[in-house]
Swiss-Prot record:
Gene Ontology biological process terms, A to Z: translation
Family the entry assigns: Belongs to the bacterial ribosomal protein bS16 family.
UniProt-listed SUPFAM superfamilies: Ribosomal protein S16
Protein name: Small ribosomal subunit protein bS16
GO CC aspect terms: cytoplasm; small ribosomal subunit
Length: 83
């Protein structure tokens, strides 16, 4: 089982927000998550990203691989993720 840290789309039409979640790589985008780590609100001007750093580091230590989009979002918001 390959585990990924990726985005799960939520919200209404034309007003999306995303949860940063840990999922099996074969799961559908909006499928059941193993654990929620935080959120990303692209429409908001302030407080766009919130993530539980301890849980994120724990999952990275267990071998979870963040998606490219999650890496970009977190690096853009001063949370360094190694490539």
């Amino acid at each position: 089982m390959s585990v990924r840290i990726r985005l799960k789309r939520m919200g209404a039409k034309k007003r999306p927000y995303y949860r940063i979640v840990v999922m099996d790589s074969a799961s559908p985008r909006d499928g059941r998550a193993i654990e929620e780590l935080g959120y990303y609100h692209p429409v908001e001007k302030q407080n766009q990203v919130k993530i539980n750093e301890n849980k994120f580091r724990d999952w990275i230590g267990k071998g979870a691989i963040p998606s490219d989009t999650v890496k970009k979002i977190l690096n853009k918001n001063n949370f360094k993720v190694e490539s």
